[in-house]
């Protein structure tokens, strides 16, 4: 079983590390090509392209400039500990045991605009390059054209290595669009998280993102390997709703706190 999650815009390079082990990203040659393109952008161009403030654009221009092809624990940190968004609040990788990291390294992948696919312990230098950004490059007009089949092929390698054919899609639509489902040697299961608001169940972005992290943690902590085991997920009040679910979609609901 291979879990897919999105990266985060918020990064943490200050907190103490809970493991000293690390691996290197497997698609660094591709990342270096994107850095080459990104370095051509001025801060105002970055601000316009990414729809971010001038201050953030300056920070990210500096990140592109400072990026080096040689990754060390001094200039990078493990991806699963560097990302700090809603998904990662639910995941709480900073509390993982070494055995948890081992299982995650085999069964969890983070999709990335710059790095393509990251394993949890892959070192990552700070960056911001969302998958949906229209960064022109030698392979096309955006990052989807740049990555082509590369991400899908890398995921197929991971599935083959564990002798499995199930992908748990906990990534956002923006990131999962970088995967070619028809070329993926796997059944795709998508958990959906609905929260009650004013008597109706719907996707509330903040809660849904955190729930994707909670589900990832549930799979890792319990060493789950079969999709039917996911129906036991009950973190923070969620419950499985079989009637609303279908073959490829598992629906989890949570009642409004009253």
Curated annotation (Swiss-Prot):
Organism: Escherichia coli O127:H6 (strain E2348/69 / EPEC)
Family: Belongs to the UPF0246 family.
Assigned GO CC terms: cytosol
NCBIfam families per UniProt: PRK02101.1-1, PRK02101.1-3
This protein's encoding gene: yaaA
Any GO BP annotation: response to hydroperoxide
Name of the protein in question: UPF0246 protein YaaA
One Pfam family named in its UniProt record: H2O2_YaaD
């Amino acid at each position: 079983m291979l879990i897919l999650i999105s990266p985060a815009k918020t990064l943490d390079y200050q907190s103490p590390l809970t493991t000293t082990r690390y691996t290197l990203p497997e698609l660094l040659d591709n990342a270096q090509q994107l850095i080459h393109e990104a370095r051509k952008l001025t801060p105002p161009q970055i601000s316009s392209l990414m729809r971010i403030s001038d201050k953030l654009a300056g920070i990210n221009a500096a990140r592109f400039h400072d990026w080096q092809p040689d990754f060390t624990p001094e200039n990078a940190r493990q991806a699963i500990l560097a990302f700090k968004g809603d998904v990662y609040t639910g995941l709480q990788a900073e509390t993982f045991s070494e055995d948890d990291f081992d299982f995650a390294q085999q069964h969890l992948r983070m999709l990335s605009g710059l790095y393509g696919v990251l394993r949890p312990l892959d070192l990552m230098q700070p960056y911001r390059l969302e998958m949906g950004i229209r960064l022109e490059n030698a392979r096309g007009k955006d990052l989807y054209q740049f990555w082509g089949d590369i991400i899908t092929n890398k995921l197929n390698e991971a599935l083959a290595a564990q002798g499995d054919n199930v992908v748990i899609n906990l990534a956002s639509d923006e990131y999962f669009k970088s995967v070619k489902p028809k070329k993926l040697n796997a059944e795709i299961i998508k958990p959906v998280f609905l929260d009650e608001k004013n008597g109706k169940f719907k996707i509330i972005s903040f809660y849904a993102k955190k729930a994707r992290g909670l589900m990832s943690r549930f799979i890792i902590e319990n060493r789950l390997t079969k999709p039917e085991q996911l129906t036991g997920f009950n973190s923070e009040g969620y419950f499985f709703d079989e009637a609303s679910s279908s073959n490829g979609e598992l629906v989890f609901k949570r009642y409004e706190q009253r």
